[in-house]
A protein has these predicted regions:
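Active-site HxH/HxHxD metal-binding segment of metal-dependent hydrolases
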Residues: 82-85, 92-168, 282
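Accessory terminal helices/loops
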Residues: 29-40, 198, 212-302
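Intrinsically disordered, low-complexity segments enriched in serine/proline and basic residues
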Residues: 2-3, 7
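Bacterial N-terminal signal peptides that target proteins for export
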Residues: 13-22
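Conserved beta-strand hairpin/beta-sheet module of binuclear metal-dependent hydrolase folds
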Residues: 40-94, 98, 191-212
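Active-site neighborhood of phospho(di)ester-bond hydrolases with catalytic His/Asp-centered motifs
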Residues: 76-78, 101-110, 128-131, 180-183, ...
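Metallo-beta-lactamase
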Residues: 36-37, 43-44, 49-51, 100, ...
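Active-site environment of divalent metal-dependent phosphoester hydrolases
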Residues: 83, 109-115, 135-138, 186-189, ...
Length: 302
């Protein structure tokens, strides 16, 4: 990125844009670094309505979403093994029953997003849907994961349905679409749906993950040889998605806490989670980080 000339103060719009880019770059690095610390960001956080039938029931950074329908509910991401108790408390605080969850989805088969699935499956009897690329990872309790299988495992679960790229999953008239966005994990999935508010329809994107975990090589990866090409595919896919509400597997991807505080102050219009510019900036920053590492690794090759 070109260095700005010191010709005078930035305009408000330029300042906001630069702040967004710096934040996104920081998130791209911090989200990868957080993998070093077990249960990072797994502190209790208030459950709240984002818009329409879409609710946040996750923790400070480990995001979980409740999507309510007349025929039962979706739950996207289950957190660590001890996260389900907080998810349940949030669901019930919002006036819903955890036993009405019918489908458990996930963004990726890393332990911070799926270790709680066994608890929730037992509690709710819900069906587990997962990327067809990560069925084996979930059913092995993470042992076959290309990055963390050697270090961190979790209770294995039975996957009831293997989700393919582009598949639409419908419950009670509400549809979520799966977009394979691999690289961060081999079956990382970005989900999309639509919500409505005041007669207007909004496109929601739940980013599955774009960071490169610590210690992961993009060139000559021993257990994930196609990782670099998968990342390239992911950025093409993310750029193709229409996004109004920018959400993700980690609250840090999209500044969740700050946006929640703005919404809680009351009267925030538009809804602070409507952030298409923030989405584009996030994707730009994540791709730049990927390309920088890829270039550096190629230079170091003999």
């Amino acid at each position: 990125m070109p260095v700005a000339k010191a010709a005078g103060p930035l305009s408000y719009n330029e300042s906001v844009k630069r702040s967004r880019l710096l934040l996104a770059l920081a998130v791209a690095v911090a989200s990868a670094a957080s993998a070093r610390t077990p249960h990072e960001g797994n502190k209790r956080f208030p459950a709240y309505r984002i818009m329409d039938n879409l609710y946040y029931v996750g923790t400070e950074d480990i995001a979980s979403y409740l999507i309510v329908t007349p025929k039962g509910h979706f739950l996207l991401n289950s957190g660590y093994e001890d996260t389900p108790a907080m998810i349940r408390a949030g669901v019930e605080k919002l006036g819903f029953k955890i036993t009405d969850v019918k489908i458990l989805l996930n963004s990726q088969a890393h332990y911070d997003h799926v270790a709680g699935q066994a608890v929730l499956q037992k509690l709710t009897g819900a069906k587990i849907y997962s990327s067809e690329r990560e069925v084996g990872v979930l059913q092995s309790g993470g042992k076959s994961d290309s990055r963390f299988g050697r270090e961190v495992t979790y209770p294995p679960v039975h996957v009831d349905h293997a989700v393919s790229d582009g598949e639409r999953v419908t419950l009670g008239g509400v549809t979520l679409t799966a977009h394979l966005t691999p690289g961060h994990s081999i079956g990382c999935t970005t989900w999309t749906m639509q919500v409505a508010d005041a007669g207007k329809v909004y496109d929601v994107v739940f980013v599955g993950g774009t960071s490169i975990n610590p210690g992961v090589r993009l060139v000559d990866h021993p257990t994930y040889p196609g990782i670099a090409e998968d990342f390239k595919r992911t950025f093409r896919t993310l750029r193709s998605l229409k996004c109004d509400l920018f959400l993700g597997a980690h609250g840090g991807y999209y500044g969740m806490i700050e946006k929640y505080k703005r919404m809680e102050k009351g009267g925030a219009q538009p809804n602070p989670f409507i952030d298409p510019e923030g989405y584009r900036t996030y994707v730009d920053a994540a791709e730049a980080h990927f390309l920088d590492q890829l270039s550096a690794e190629k230079v170091r090759q003999p």
